[in-house]
Every structure is written in structure tokens, then in C-alpha cells.
């Protein structure tokens, strides 16, 4: 029994994925995959939801995605799970945003956005996710597609990364 527990703990500690979490209050929804929170001593942080890419606000379903996130998160206390860096429980990404999973009452909000057909699983950064999480996100996207939920109700929804690329050139 002790050996099994020890092995599980060691497996976790030696895992290539090291995550920490911190509690924060959601104060603003930027779009379907970005929020502002107050953390610690009222420090404002911008959070980019890990593993998803929601439609941009000017895209089809961009407003719906943002509205849904606002409905379920605005004003709520959440846990943010992110990779720790130095003395902080988070790492900043390229645009100086915390990249993390948002958890509300034990539920994975990033995953919920995919299940509701309001975001893609952002596979470009899948290496930043544990394997079981990747599988859950892939499965959720497949099921939403099959059921024509949200953005999947359109014939050929344009992924936000392609939309951004097309609109940068203009």
C-alpha cells in the first residue's frame, strides 16, 4: 500500500508537467479565451485559457463565445492552474498573459468551452498539456462536431488562427 502511494507521488513529481494553482476573482471577460482576474493583493492578471482557441469577436460565434464565458465566470472566484515560474505560481506567455486552465467549482472551464462548441482545441500548443487533458479536449471537440453544437452548426467554421492570419494581411 505504502509502496503504491510512494510510486504515485514520485510519478507525479517526476512528471514533465509541473503545475501550480492560485485563486483569483474574474473581473473582466476580454473574449472567449481571455479573461482578467484579480490575484493576491489585488494584482490584475490577464489569463489566456490553455488549450483552446475561441473565435475572435469579429468572427461568427465570437460574440456568443465571449458572452457565454461572461455568463459563467464574471465576478466568480476561480482557480487558475498554470506552470510555475521562479517565485510566482504562473508563467507569462508571449503576449505577457498567464497561460492556464480555469477551474470553477471543480469544473474545467476550458474544456466546457470546447464541449459547448464555443472554442477549438488549440492543438498547436498541445505539448503544454498533460496527455489525459489533450485526450479530453480532443474528444470534446469531436463530440461537439458530431452533434453540430455551437460553431459546429456552420458548414465550414473558420478556425481563429486562420482568421487572424487572413486579417493580418489586410
Task: Indicate where each model-derived feature is located.
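Small beta-barrel nucleic-acid-binding modules, primarily SNase/OB-fold domains
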Residues: 2, 6-7, 16-170
Amino acid at each position: 500500500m505504502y509502496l503504491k502511494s510512494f510510486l504515485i507521488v514520485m510519478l507525479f513529481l517526476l512528471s514533465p508537467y509541473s503545475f501550480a494553482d492560485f485563486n483569483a476573482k474574474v473581473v473582466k471577460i476580454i473574449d472567449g479565451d481571455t479573461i482578467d482576474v484579480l490575484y493576491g493583493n489585488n494584482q490584475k492578471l490577464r489569463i489566456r485559457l490553455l488549450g483552446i482557441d475561441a473565435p475572435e469577436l469579429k468572427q461568427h460565434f465570437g460574440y456568443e463565445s465571449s458572452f457565454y464565458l461572461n455568463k459563467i465566470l464574471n465576478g466568480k472566484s476561480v482557480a487558475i492552474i498554470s506552470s510555475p515560474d521562479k517565485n510566482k505560481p504562473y508563467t507569462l506567455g508571449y503576449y505577457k498573459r498567464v497561460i492556464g486552465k480555469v477551474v470553477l467549482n471543480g469544473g474545467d472551464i476550458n474544456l466546457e468551452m470546447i464541449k459547448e462548441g464555443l472554442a477549438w482545441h488549440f492543438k498547436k500548443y498541445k505539448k503544454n498539456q498533460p496527455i489525459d487533458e489533450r485526450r479530453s479536449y480532443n474528444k470534446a471537440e469531436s463530440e461537439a462536431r458530431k452533434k453540430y453544437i455551437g460553431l459546429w452548426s456552420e458548414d465550414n467554421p473558420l478556425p481563429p488562427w486562420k482568421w487572424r492570419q487572413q486579417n493580418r494581411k489586410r
